[in-house]
């Protein structure tokens, strides 16, 4: 079974330490987030994860994109849409993905181990933002589709940068406030034309949305099961075998490190429903809020449980 992560990892940016870094800082070229990316890559590699992330160290999942996309801005920590949504001049995440890939290739030449490209989904971007201009805040469909057009370009940038797969994060889809038909059209628009696997991450209770999600044109549905064991019942009831399942099997809301046996038993329950060959083993969600030691230990036990 392939092991992966959902995205964020608890490493911190740091200031310049070496002479070379201080010189870069003097000339305005030092990137304080690169040490955090390198630390995230090394931790995930040491834990044995197959498809890693760059750690998503530059900020929260909405703000990082909103700060770069035309027609959006951040005020007092809130994402605001003030004009028509347009693409940035370049990629938002390709440089970090390439850097993470370079670090990984320095650790191993095993091409089965790669870096996933991650984008925050169009519905989550729009519903997490305050609309102050151009779009109707009571009818967000147009904004969602314009955002999908921007994110389709970003997904292609990430693919061209060497991403092993593309993950679209859509936590808002389980909340009940999103128009699922529009959400599906937006996701399908992003996925169309990509040559690598596309995974859709939706955390939360999937009881009212799984039937819709199964119709989306993605290769993998990434869902949480450790923190929401009731999702297993929903999966068993509604599953049809035309997609992979990203199987969240460690709880990212608690510092408690699950034992290998506990994780293994949960994975077995998932395999009994969808088949071991359809499982991608990962945490429930991002790990940003966990202590680094707990995050690493959870990943290590997860990988060992998946391999035994």
UniProtKB/Swiss-Prot annotation:
Its EC number is 2.1.1.-. Its cofactor is Zn(2+). The keyword Cytoplasm does not apply. One of its GO terms (biological process) is methylation. Zn(2+) binds at residues 201, 203, 224, 285. Pathway: Amino-acid biosynthesis; L-methionine biosynthesis via de novo pathway. It is an enzyme of class 2 (transferase). GO terms for molecular function: 5-methyltetrahydropteroyltriglutamate-homocysteine S-methyltransferase activity; zinc ion binding. InterPro entries: Met_Synth_C/arc (IPR002629), MetE_arc (IPR022921), UROD/MetE-like_sf (IPR038071). Keywords: Amino-acid biosynthesis, Metal-binding, Methionine biosynthesis, Methyltransferase, Transferase, Zinc. Transmembrane segments: none annotated. Binds 1 zinc ion per subunit. Belongs to the archaeal MetE family. NCBIfam families: PRK00957.1. Catalyzes the transfer of a methyl group to L-homocysteine resulting in methionine formation. Can use methylcobalamin and methylcobinamide as methyl donors, but methylcobalamin is not considered to be the physiological substrate. HAMAP family: MetE. This is Methionine synthase. The gene is metE.
């Amino acid at each position: 079974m392939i092991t992966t992560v959902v995205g964020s990892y608890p490493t911190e940016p740091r200031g310049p330490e070496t002479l070379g870094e201080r010189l870069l800082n003097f000339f305005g070229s030092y990137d304080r987030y690169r040490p955090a990316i390198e630390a995230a890559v090394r931790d995930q590699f040491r834990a044995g994860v197959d498809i890693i992330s760059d750690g998503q160290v530059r900020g929260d999942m909405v703000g990082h994109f909103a700060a770069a996309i035309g027609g959006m801005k951040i005020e007092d920590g809130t994402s605001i849409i003030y004009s028509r949504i347009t693409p940035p001049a370049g990629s938002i995440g390709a440089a970090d993905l390439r850097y993470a890939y370079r670090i990984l290739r320095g650790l191993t030449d095993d091409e089965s181990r790669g870096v996933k490209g991650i984008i925050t989904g169009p519905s989550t971007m729009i519903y997490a933002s305050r609309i102050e201009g151009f779009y109707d805040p009571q009818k967000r469909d147009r904004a969602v589709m314009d955002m999908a057009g921007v994110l389709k370009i970003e997904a292609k940038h990430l693919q061209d940068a060497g991403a092993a797969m593309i993950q679209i994060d859509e936590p808002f889809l389980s909340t009940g406030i999103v128009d699922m038909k529009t959400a599906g059209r937006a996701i399908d628009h992003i996925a169309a034309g990509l040559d690598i696997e596309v995974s859709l991450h939706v955390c939360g209770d999937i009881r009212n949305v799984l039937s819709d999600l199964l119709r989306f044109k993605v290769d993998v549905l990434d869902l949480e099961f450790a923190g929401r064991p009731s999702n297993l019942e929903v999966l068993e009831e509604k599953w049809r075998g035309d997609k992979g399942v990203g199987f969240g099997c460690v709880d990212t809301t608690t510092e408690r490190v699950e034992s290998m046996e506990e994780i293994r038993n949960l994975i077995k329950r998932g395999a009994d429903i969808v088949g071991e060959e359809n499982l991608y083993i990962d945490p429930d969600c991002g790990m940003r809020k966990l202590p680094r030691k707990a995050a690493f230990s959870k990943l290590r036990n997860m990988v060992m449980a998946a391999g035994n």
